[in-house]
Regions:
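Short beta-strand/loop motif that positions the catalytic acidic residue
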Residues: 154, 160-162, 166
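Conserved alpha/beta-hydrolase
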Residues: 49-69
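Catalytic histidine-centered segment of alpha/beta-hydrolase-like enzymes
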Residues: 71, 196-207
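The serine-hydrolase catalytic nucleophile loop
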Residues: 37-49, 64, 172-173
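N-terminal cap/lid segment of alpha/beta-hydrolase-fold proteins
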Residues: 1-25
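Acidic catalytic loop of the alpha/beta-hydrolase fold
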Residues: 165-169, 199
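Catalytic nucleophile-loop/oxyanion-hole region of alpha/beta-hydrolase
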Residues: 65-92, 203
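Primarily recognizes the serine-hydrolase "nucleophile elbow" in alpha/beta-hydrolase
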Residues: 84-147
């Protein structure tokens, strides 16, 4: 699938991004957000973008301004993700059917984006913390952010994806999101990827995850 380098303007900074485009005209566009301390070239991020493009969806991956601890925060991550959504909305090859996919910390950012931006039709939270934990010091002074409550206000459909071998973000986080979403009557679904770890390795579970995410997102954006 073709891809192109893009610059994402956020405040006084330009973020480096890669836009994966389908072979035919896209049905919509999705921002794909990596995790805390990760980067957009990680195998599960690239594989997800490739599979989305094969499903007819333009997929944008990028590096946050401060993507290493301790400088990365939900404030900065949310602003960067909003910049990615703006780029997708303005791109001539991307119809205004928008979604967001986030992994780990990026999933928490995705929850905030989907809760605040009414243009988002589909949101995927993959191994996303529902509340601050010891591994997420970026939240230490950000008690104002309540991702579960904010996501409950979304107009989007929500997919919650977890690996059965994830030893970093317990499955109870998915259940917490789902309980509040269901109470708010937000359409949601939980999918467990058997054998997948926090990054959905090894290759077999990763392929199952990307197929699940891309197929679900295609329906959400239709």
């Amino acid at each position: 699938m073709p891809s192109q380098r893009v610059g994402i303007r956020v405040e006084d900074t330009e973020l480096d991004g890669v836009l994966h485009l389908p072979a035919a005209r896209a049905i919509g566009g999705v921002a794909v957000l990596h995790g805390f301390g990760g980067d957009p070239s990680q195998p599960h991020i690239v594989a997800t973008c490739d599979e989305l493009a094969r499903a007819g969806i333009a997929a944008l991956r990028f590096a946050y301004r401060d993507h290493q601890p301790p400088r990365m925060t939900l404030d900065s991550g949310l602003a960067d993700a909003a910049g990615a959504i703006r780029l997708l909305k303005a791109h001539p090859d991307v119809p205004e059917r928008l979604g967001v996919v986030g992994f780990s910390f990026g999933g928490t950012v995705a929850a905030l984006v989907a809760g605040r931006d009414s243009r988002i039709r589909g949101a995927v939270l993959a191994a996303a913390p529902a509340a601050p934990g010891p591994s997420f010091t970026a939240w230490s002074n950000e008690g104002k952010w309540k991702p579960v409550a904010e996501l409950s206000r979304t107009r989007a459909r929500v997919l919650l994806v977890w690996g059965s071998r994830d030893d970093q973000v317990p499955f109870e986080n998915a259940e917490r999101y789902a309980a509040v979403l269901s109470q708010a009557r937000v359409p949601n679904r939980i999918v467990t990827i058997e054998g997948g770890d926090h990054d959905f390795a090894p290759a077999g579970p990763r392929a199952k995850m990307t197929e699940t995410v891309a197929g679900w997102m295609r329906e959400a954006l239709a």
